[in-house]
Amino acid sequence: MYGNLANKLILDAKRSSNLSETPLYQTDLVKSIIKETTDLNKDAEYLGEEQRIQEEDSENADEEKMKINQCQLFVTHLCMRRNKRCLLAYEKLRADKIDEFSWLNIDPITETGNTDPNKNKFGSTGNGSNSLVSNSANYTTQLNLDNLNHAEQEYYKNYQHLITNYKSNFADIDLSGDLDPPTNIFTDVRVLKNGGEVQTEYGVFNLIKDSQFYVRKSDVERLIQQGYLEEI
């Protein structure tokens, strides 16, 4: 049935909207929707030609048949428009997640495995600046480049370049910092997954799952972004 494939794509987008990582691009499903839309367009062209012929020969035309033809043409156009809207919504959601991740200055995952939790995109340690967001659970904190199609990889690369150029005009301002000042300098955190050793100004601690620490928030902000820690 027309529209079922687009519905599957939207359901996939809905499931991934609250994930902290960008899932695999649905290449086969997108291609199938495009093919379906192309077939619908051919049907619309045929129905449009039929309607034109009937209107030119209105004296001998069957009025009931004309109404059926108009209804078929209308429904066909609706299906095409819905497919287009679903495709655009899916692409926009993924583009928004790429944009969101780009501002966090975190290394994307280029292959299976974890990145170093103590390093951000520019190789600095975990005591970096305040983050764009304070609760990583609702934001994109992981980006596996293998899950992006070629166009998305190019988009990510160009968007990163755009951000870098923009930030260079405001060297004294942390544009990726949180707009709201922290309520407390120190905070309690819980480790969500195992990691390496973290060096801070006040000492060293190891990322061992389910362990808890009382640390300066600015020292672990990047780890919270990456999903290694959560505030409690």
From Swiss-Prot:
GO terms for biological process: DNA strand elongation involved in mitotic DNA replication; double-strand break repair via break-induced replication; mitotic DNA replication initiation. The GINS complex plays an essential role in the initiation of DNA replication. It holds the Pfam family Sld5. Keywords: DNA replication, Nucleus. This is DNA replication complex GINS protein PSF1. GO terms for cellular component: CMG complex; GINS complex; nuclear replication fork. InterPro entries: GINS_A, GINS_bundle-like_dom_sf, GINS_Psf1, PSF1_C. It comes from the Eukaryota. Component of the GINS complex which is a heterotetramer of SLD5, PSF1, PSF2 and PSF3. Belongs to the GINS1/PSF1 family. It is found in: Nucleus.
